[in-house]
Amino acid sequence: MTTPAPPSFELPEELAIDTTAARRIIGEFIRAQLSQAGFGKVLLGLSGGIDSALVAYLAAEAIGPQQVLAVLMPYRTSSPESRADAETVVAELGCPSELVDISAIVDGYFEPDRTDAAPLRRGNFMARARMMVLYDHSVTWGGLVIGTGNKTETLIGYSTLWGDSASAFNPIGDLYKSQIRQLSAAMGVPQAIIAKAPSADLWPGQTDEAEVGFSYAEVDRILFRLVDRRLSIDEVVADGFERELVDRVDRMVAGSEFKRQVPPIAKIGPRTAGIDYLYPRRRPRSTRD
């Protein structure tokens, strides 16, 4: 595994986090979610990228590495370096792992009748194939699927519905990509993983930033202003950002709202699940309250 030059983790003041506090909060969150659901183990798809690597480290710290199953799910065109990075994480943490090649699943669907499918369509199918593998393994492993999506991708909709966005709970969903890098450095995630260009590895040479057309460093600062500070587009532009980019990010957030919500239900009866029949996950046993 080739180690790139160390990147800078100097974040704008508004994005810098207390990594010690974040580790404590996330560790408590993981343990609480498992306790409420009556489980003691988790599993995740380990791609070799920074997001899943960080979640593996956080989960191993919270409940012990032997309670964390890392599932490696390459496709035939996946980067060998990504698999090597994932194997490095497994070796350093000492957690159990499984290797499931999804090529037969994906190719069995697209060939021979759908060979003209666009890369994005194939990529979405691959993400959902990995979700199926994870949830099947959750039965044999006896654990909950833990999410690996970050706040940046969730807000701009850069995820596959019922694919990489599917999980029982997500410990890093409120961390922007810039903050993921900061926390990963504090956790001891391998430098090669932190420094490499983010990629969903959906097709050869694919990178996240090239696909969306902007850098995480810039979009995180815009999202923080639009979402966390609730600034208007004009106010964000006044902070020095290009209006065209701010407008585009705002449209992406608004246009992907459906990905962040459960499917709407047509209300017919007096109490409707998800509307006026709502409980925390650890709800009282009575349905009459």
Identify the meaning behind each predicted range:
Residues T2-L44, L54, L58-E61, Q66-L72, ...:
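ATP/NTP-dependent adenylation/nucleotidyl-transfer catalytic domains that generate, transfer
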Residues G49:
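Conserved G/P- and acidic residue-centered "switch" motifs that form tight phosphate/ATP-binding loops
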